[in-house]
UniProtKB/Swiss-Prot annotation:
The UniProt record lists the keyword S-adenosyl-L-methionine: no
Binding-site list for Zn(2+): 78, 237, 241
Any one Gene Ontology molecular-function term assigned to this protein's record: metal ion binding
Gene (name only): lpxC
EC assignment: 3.5.1.108
Biological source species: Paraburkholderia xenovorans (strain LB400)
The family this protein is said to belong to: Belongs to the LpxC family.
Source taxonomy: Bacteria, Pseudomonadati, Pseudomonadota, Betaproteobacteria, Burkholderiales
UniProt-recorded name of the protein: UDP-3-O-acyl-N-acetylglucosamine deacetylase
Keyword Lipid metabolism: yes
Single GO BP term: lipid A biosynthetic process
Length: 305
């Protein structure tokens, strides 16, 4: 049986919020079978638990934001991406602010944190959402689409008219049957343009942003002295984001995802469209791990090993 997974022990870290610039304490705790990923604002007078779900995403302008009873947790996509890549089904995420810390701007720190805690299989079948009919959302020339596929693959195209991005490639296709999330995707950092960062700071945003947690570009080049971690780091980060955005649906998807210039809003709209049509998906489990898609039939640390 392909089993659900959580972490073995509690782990903690401290970072800063990308937009607030304030210190944030993050604690990951094991959770029982069928709990899902649950975020908890433990800094509030009465802590608020917000289970990750497509319908709980209330703001997607700058990040994916979970909202419930007036409480919010922002910038969840990198941590959710790490959970997807490591096959974590159940987890409590305690946070002392309304933002998940940005860490180094990638999912790498969260992968390290989860692996440090250890991963434990649970005595319950892992549930998948198997897409059975195509679902698509469009917004002008942008689109995001899910098609039936026995596995999980993504094809993402960005369109940033910038010399440094042009040089590294604007499109990427990955099938996790033969690609390692941890090695090939997890370390791709978020990126921004210097003039946009200044504008955002004037609006009280991006106060925690720096070259320690983002790739920063001027009109012509990358400003970070250490350059890129991957030749195609820009499009890989957008794929990393998409993996995290899609994982809020509650279970891993068995599907092929195709997107052009998609972002948090379009990704969430795609999930809502999927869930609105019950004939377009089914929940499946695998009693025989050998019959599960490659990439999920793992025996070791990661889902997309």
């Amino acid at each position: 049986m392909l089993k659900q997974r959580t972490i073995k022990q509690i782990v903690k870290t401290v970072g800063i919020g990308l937009h607030s610039g304030r210190k944030v304490e993050l604690t990951l705790r094991p959770a029982g079978p069928d709990t899902g990923i649950v975020f908890s604002r433990v800094d509030l007078a009465t802590p608020v638990d917000i289970p990750a779900s497509a319908m709980a995403i209330g703001d997607t302008r700058l990040a994916s934001v979970l909202q419930k009873d007036g409480a919010r947790v922002s910038t969840i996509e990198h941590l959710m991406s790490a959970c997807a890549g490591l096959g974590i089904d159940n987890l409590y995420v305690d946070v002392t602010a309304e933002e998940i810390p940005i860490m180094d701007g990638s999912a790498g720190s969260f992968v390290f944190l989860i692996q440090s805690a250890g991963i434990e299989e649970q005595n319950a079948a892992k549930k998948f959402i198997k897409v059975t009919k195509p679902v698509e959302i469009r917004d002008g020339d942008k689109f995001a689409r899910l098609d039936p596929y026995f596995g999980f693959k993504l094809k993402f195209t960005i369109d940033f008219r910038h010399p440094a991005v042009d040089k590294t490639g604007q499109a990427l296709e990955v099938d996790f049957a033969n690609t390692s999330y941890v090695r090939e995707i997890a370390r791709a950092r978020t990126f921004g343009f210097a003039h946009e960062v200044e504008m955002m700071r004037e609006l009280g945003l991006a106060r925690g942003g720096s070259m320690d947690n983002a790739i920063v570009l001027d009109e012509y080049r990358i400003l970070n002295n250490d350059g890129l971690r991957y030749d195609d780091e820009f499009v890989k980060h957008k794929m990393l984001d998409a993996i995290g955005d899609l994982y809020v649906v509650g279970h891993p998807l068995l599907a092929s995802y195709t997107a052009y210039k998609s972002g948090h809003g379009l990704n969430n709209a795609l999930l809502r469209e999927l869930l609105a049509h019950e004939d377009s998906y089914e929940i499946v489990t695998f009693d025989d791990t050998q019959k599960a898609p490659r990439g999920f039939a793992y025996e070791t640390q990661t889902a997309f090993a």
